[in-house]
Amino acid sequence: MTTQTFRSDFLRTLHERGYIHQCSDLERLDAKAAEGPITAYIGFDATASSLHAGHLLSIMMLRTLQRTGHNPIALMGGGTTKIGDPSGKDEARKMLTDQQIEDNIASIRKVFARFLDFGAGAKMENNASWLDELKYIPLLREVGPHFTINRMLTFDSVKLRLEREQPLTFLEFNYMILQAYDFVELNARHGCILQMGGSDQWGNIVNGMELGRRMRGADLFALTTPLLTTSSGAKMGKTAGGAVWLDADLLSPYEYWQYWRNAGDADVERFLKLFTELPLDEIARLAALEGQEINHAKEVLATEATALLHGREAAEKAKETSRATFADGALAVDLPTVEVPRATLEAGLPVAKAFVDAGLVASTSEARRQIKGGGLKVNDVTVTDEKAVIDLGALTPEGVVKLSLGKKKHVLLKPV
């Protein structure tokens, strides 16, 4: 479908801004959304106390859904988190207590409240409210006939573990069944007809769609987004310093602003479409900037993305702090520079070793102590992961990586 043929504002907006990867029936879903408000959901694990930038694509889809007159549901996996999604994992996830999961959900709700209006159609649900109440034999009789072991073994989350001869527990094997059941339950409770998610979740989403059709005769839809990486191949939401958290207690608005300011030139237009609400003609103007002027577009990206999460005042303050710190190219000119072989960054330089090589700490053990105390930063983002590596994706627009110990000691790594 082209932009002109969409009848619904919701899908037209998603299409124009590059959110759509795959849909079970785009034309019929568009017709439904054009007729009146629809209800759609995206599921989120409760494995951490915050979401990170890798979740933003899903959050922005829910926000777009609400802004175009529909009803979003943010489904927290309070029940499924007790099992753990085996997708993309080589081993079983760490088991969390019920209290840890509840605390995580309470914290994550604050993030959603920045993007969704829970008083105007948006809802947050917790699948523990129905999964915890299921009885085993009735579940097997009601849901079991609709799943074949043959098909379940073809899913990547299962197949990859078995091919690698890594254990897959019966607990994890049940994850896809319970995840599919969520769609059935949300359709029954809220008339929900659409599940959205990343393209890696396509099989799980289609499972739920088919289960709803078989159990309830429901007319359901699946829609996925592209799996997003930066132009350097890095995973969204990850930096050399660790995860880019959406919680100001874990990552300051200034550090969040810096994450977006450090976007690669090739990513600017795409990120402006996906992670800001600027008009498309303004985005096209910014994307056309060249040379040093592209840095203005990156500042706009950083400020608009930060304003959505932390508010306009915090975003403007972060921008001014950055300008005061790096006015007139001070970053590239005035700081001591250590050269590293480009091949070293291509292979991935352990962050602790990088600080040793830069002369900022005496040993990797000291670097690890500093990381635990929040004393090290890469490109002005606090390092939280001792095992993080610095690669070419960490290069700033100036072609360097900035390492900081505390507030006053800075060194630039420059690939040669």
UniProtKB/Swiss-Prot annotation:
GO function term, MF aspect, one: ATP binding
EC number: 6.1.1.1
Binding of L-tyrosine, residues: Y41, Y175, Q179
Protein name in UniProt: Tyrosine--tRNA ligase
Subunit structure: Homodimer.
GO cellular component, one term: cytosol
Localization of this protein: Cytoplasm
Domain of life from the UniProt record: Bacteria
SUPFAM superfamilies: Alpha-L RNA-binding motif (SSF55174), Nucleotidylyl transferase (SSF52374)
Species the sequence originates in: Xanthobacter autotrophicus (strain ATCC BAA-1158 / Py2)
Key word RNA-binding present: yes
InterPro entries linked: aa-tRNA-synth_Ic (IPR002305), Rossmann-like_a/b/a_fold (IPR014729), S4_RNA-bd_sf (IPR036986), SYY-like_C (IPR054608), Tyr-tRNA-ligase (IPR002307), Tyr-tRNA-ligase_bac-type (IPR024088), Tyr-tRNA-ligase_bac_1 (IPR024107)
UniProt short sequence motif 'KMSKS' region, positions renumbered to this chain: 235-239
Residue positions binding ATP: K238
Chief localization: cytoplasm
Family: Belongs to the class-I aminoacyl-tRNA synthetase family. TyrS type 1 subfamily.
Motif ('HIGH' region): 46-55
One GO BP annotation of this record: tyrosyl-tRNA aminoacylation
Keyword list, A-Z: Aminoacyl-tRNA synthetase, ATP-binding, Cytoplasm, Ligase, Nucleotide-binding, Protein biosynthesis, RNA-binding
Function: Catalyzes the attachment of tyrosine to tRNA(Tyr) in a two-step reaction: tyrosine is first activated by ATP to form Tyr-AMP and then transferred to the acceptor end of tRNA(Tyr).
